[in-house]
Amino acid sequence: MTEIQKLTNNKEIIAYLAEKFPLCFSLEGEAKPLKIGLFQDLAEALANDEKVSKTQLRQALRQYTSNWRYLHGCRAGAVRVDLNGEPAGILEQEHVEHAAAKLAEAKAKVAERRAVEKANNPKANKKRSVHHSGNKSENKKSAGKKFSNPRQVEQIFVNVDLANLQKGDVVRVKAGDKTTKAEILEVVKEGARVELENGLILTVSADRLFA
């Protein structure tokens, strides 16, 4: 008898749901608003499925409906869908406003985190400058060699969550010891297609994408 392999995290469960109900759930692009009460339909549809439990389904749904892809799709006039992708009512205005507020809150947190990181870097760079201020000629030489771009030395980048990326988002792409700004063109499996500032388009893995 083959042993059932249980799914252990939300990402695996969401991928499983997208495989079982592709017209309802998606892993890329804008997500469709879900039917009110979909959890009950889902629990009944997977009642005999030993891979997932109701508790896991509830947690995975909570994560799915709170990511940026889903919140972007909750706009005025959007149509909810059931497990089969069939229309299940127009999104109510209060839910549109709630989604917009959640999205703004999430983006504000990211912006705040970036601001804190940016604010911390000049302080570190200033300490380095004071430490080396004894000899002007040596300072100039050091600035040319070691500190020509202190941000690259000091700045700490945070890996982005692919589930939160949208087309048009601006990220940083790491190439060796350097990073460059890029715009997301498409989120793909385990990475994203991006356009660099010089116009070059390429696909990069998730571990090279930073906020």
Swiss-Prot record:
Example of a GO cellular component annotation carried by this entry: cytosol
Task: Please name the SUPFAM superfamilies in this protein's record.
Answer: FinO-like
Family matches, as NCBIfam families: PRK04950.1 (NF003434)
Q: What is its main location?
A: cytoplasm
Q: Which domain of life is it from?
A: Bacteria
Q: Where is the composition biased (Basic residues)?
A: 124-134
What is the name of this protein? Answer: RNA chaperone ProQ
Going by the UniProt record, its keywords in alphabetical order are: Chaperone, Cytoplasm, RNA-binding
GO BP annotations of the record are: post-transcriptional regulation of gene expression
Concerning its family, UniProt says: Belongs to the ProQ family.
Species of provenance: Histophilus somni (strain 2336) (Haemophilus somnus)
